[in-house]
């Protein structure tokens, strides 16, 4: 389903942020500069309409709660995405293909969809504007159309039992929404909305065949974020988000797709299913947490090629770091090629209105209203991980995931957060590797590790971890050297039960140390192994690799290199956004060319200072009445006053629209590799050029007048 929105007046979906102190109240827009309507605002407006229906007796409170849920543990029956302009995906593609970033900057793009309005407060007694009351507000232009994806929660029993009744109520509530955003009583935010129940094409979630399954399998999954994703911190802080997707969330997704009974049968099988955490991924290369032992010199920069030489403190010689001030590298993730990968996050600002809905804003008082912020992982990023399962488990997982429709994950997934593409894209057989006996290895924890000691108590004692490792290797003489450890807290809040989860400490991901065995051990036994407890949720992933003796302490990492795009013809686009940007740039350059022309001919104006003001006023009058440069020229020729006639003729000869346009077109054709010039109708060109010209002339006249007064 889709919710279609048409703006019947300008709209401001306040973002809670300001831009460059020039805009006091800004709209919400994405990284490309394209404005959108956040789903939480949209859903709140639909909820208001449904509440009005309840108050009028059109629907009951029970029917209302079936659709919108109830505060606490009753979830909403539908999810909603942000509302984007029609043709959003194509516009984003055009902007990303544009290699001229000065042209397609977010502010330039935003200006195509918005404009700035000013407002002030007037003293009712004096009729004069209040001091310091001038405000600027950016608004989205009326006439634009938006669409938001709307999907039923297929796990919701009310949706299964009464699909038509619930759908009809939602349809009525959507159609009743008439205003969105701020200043609704001042002419902003008038909209027309409707629910389109046409089924949308579903994404394919499984790209592997069950025939390829072996006895033991390692299934690769990828998650592409279509909207921001909130992975709440285990500490339960909504103002923070994890920078990865925990295996427990993926396991929960699979459980929901299977159903409770089938999932319990899956867990009861002899082999334990394991779902690793999903980490940031670039070009199919999965990142993993970097070692805590990697350090750099204080204030050490990257070299010209984007590389940095680090020191691995696990086995460094004192002479190598003597007289050097070493600091942690603070690198979050690296891929197999040691390219640094980073996760982009953002903060969005929200408010909850009071329980008394006659109050249209949060007050900050104890009336049920509040202001709050949510941290999330930015949309457009990819994450990947692995599912370890035997043949029967893998087949059941594939069947369940194949039946998924629109996938949403994380906190706030019923509104603007958590829309993802989830795909099982490849599978490899897990089989024993050829034996490789070594004495020394480097152990790195790729996820948090939960440990229990022999008394069944939670612990972070590294000696307990050593016993887990010895059990896998089949030895009893491991010696741990030079540990670099960090400790994290696991906890959170169970929304379903309305209770806090147990809080305890774990050894954090990125922790690393050396292990030595006098007897020697097979390092390949650790391939695809997890240690500790709750490994099915992604905890306990480790990497054990042989310690190489030569130059082990030197580590070279590199920044992600920007892709070099070939410069294509900008005018080969799908949506027209690039053409709008080119026209805006053309207009800006026309105005600049007019300004430069006047600056070059200042002496002409200064020599006729005594009649310049009257000449400019005459030209402004003619400009209002005539629609072409030629008509203006004809009117100037008819001026009876000889001196004024000559000055006016001189002034309009300085700036000829066609000449200015030809000059700008030539420059833009060269700068942007255009195949054909930007063509405007003569009247439009005349209006833009002479509006700018007469404004500059008027400003120049005032400067001359002030200069004369001072003398």
Question: Language-model segments: which ranges?
Answer:
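Conserved active-site/ligand-binding neighborhood in enzyme cores
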Residues: 1-711
């Amino acid at each position: 389903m889709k919710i279609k929105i048409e703006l019947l007046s300008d709209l401001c979906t306040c973002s809670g942020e300001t831009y460059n102190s020039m805009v006091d109240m800004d709209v919400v827009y994405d990284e490309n500069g394209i404005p959108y309507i956040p789903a939480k605002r949209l859903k709140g407006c639909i909820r208001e309409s449904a509440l009005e229906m309840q108050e009028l007796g059109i629907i009951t409170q029970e029917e209302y709660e079936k659709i919108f849920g109830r505060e606490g543990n009753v979830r909403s029956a539908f999810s909603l995405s942000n509302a984007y302009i029609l043709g959003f995906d194509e516009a984003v593609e055009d902007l990303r293909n544009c290699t001229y970033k000065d042209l397609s900057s977010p502010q330039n793009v935003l200006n195509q969809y918005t404009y700035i309005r000013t407002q002030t407060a007037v003293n009712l007694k004096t009729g004069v504007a209040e001091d310091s009351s001038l405000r600027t507000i950016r608004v989205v232009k009326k006439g634009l159309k938006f669409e938001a994806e709307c999907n039923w929660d297929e796990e919701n029993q009310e949706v299964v039992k009464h699909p038509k009744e619930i759908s009809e109520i939602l349809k009525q509530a959507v159609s009743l929404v008439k205003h969105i955003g701020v200043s609704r009583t001042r002419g902003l935010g008038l909209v027309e909305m409707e629910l389109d129940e046409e089924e949308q094409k579903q994404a394919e979630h499984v790209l592997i065949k069950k025939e390829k399954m072996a006895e033991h399998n390692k299934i690769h999954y990828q998650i592409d974020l279509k909207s921001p994703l909130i992975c709440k911190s285990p500490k339960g802080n909504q103002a923070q988000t994890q920078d990865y997707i925990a295996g427990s969330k993926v396991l929960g997704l699979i459980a929901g797709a299977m159903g409770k009974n089938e999932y319990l049968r899956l867990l009861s099988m002899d082999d334990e299913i394991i779902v690793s955490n999903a980490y940031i991924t670039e070009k199919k290369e999965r990142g993993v947490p970097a070692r805590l032992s990697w350090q750099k010199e204080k204030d050490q920069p990257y070299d010209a090629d984007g590389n940095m030489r680090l020191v691995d403190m696990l086995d460094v010689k004192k002479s190598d770091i003597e007289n050097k001030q070493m600091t942690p590298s603070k690198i979050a993730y690296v891929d197999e090629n040691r390219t640094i990968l980073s996760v982009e996050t953002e903060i969005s600002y929200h408010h909850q209105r009071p329980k008394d809905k006659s109050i249209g804003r949060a007050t900050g008082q104890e009336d049920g209203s509040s202001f709050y912020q949510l941290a999330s992982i930015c949309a457009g990023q990819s994450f990947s991980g692995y599912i370890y399962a035997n043949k029967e488990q893998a087949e059941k997982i594939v069947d369940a995931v194949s039946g998924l429709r629109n996938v949403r994950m994380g906190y706030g997934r019923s509104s603007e957060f958590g829309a993802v593409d989830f795909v099982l894209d490849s599978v490899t057989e897990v089989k024993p590797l050829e034996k490789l006996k070594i004495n020394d290895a480097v152990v790195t924890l790729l996820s948090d590790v939960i440990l229990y000691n022999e008394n069944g108590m939670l612990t972070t004692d590294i000696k307990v971890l050593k016993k887990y490792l010895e059990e896998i290797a089949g030895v009893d003489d491991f010696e741990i050297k030079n540990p670099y450890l960090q400790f994290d807290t696991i906890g959170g809040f169970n929304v379903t039960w309305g209770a806090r989860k147990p809080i305890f400490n774990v050894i954090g991901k990125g922790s690393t140390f050396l292990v030595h065995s006098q007897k020697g051990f097979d390092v390949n036994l650790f391939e695809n192994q997890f240690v500790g407890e709750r490994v099915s949720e992604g905890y306990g992933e480790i990497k054990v690799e042989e310690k190489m003796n030569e130059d082990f302490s030197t580590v070279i990492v590199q920044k992600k290199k920007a892709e070099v795009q070939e410069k294509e013809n900008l005018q080969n686009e799908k949506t027209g956004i690039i053409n709008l940007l080119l026209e805006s740039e053309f207009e800006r350059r026309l105005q600049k060319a007019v300004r430069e022309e006047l600056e070059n001919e200042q002496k002409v104006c200064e020599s006729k200072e005594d009649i310049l003001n009257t000449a400019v006023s005459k030209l402004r009058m003619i400009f209002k009445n005539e629609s072409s440069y030629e008509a203006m020229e004809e009117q100037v020729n008819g001026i009876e006053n000889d001196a004024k006639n000559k000055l006016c003729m001189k002034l309009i000869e300085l700036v000829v629209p066609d000449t200015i346009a030809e000059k700008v077109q030539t420059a833009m054709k060269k700068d942007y590799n255009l195949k054909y010039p930007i063509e405007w109708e003569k009247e439009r060109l005349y209006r833009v050029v002479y509006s700018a010209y007469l404004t500059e002339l008027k400003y120049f006249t005032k400067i001359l007048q002030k200069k004369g007064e001072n003398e």
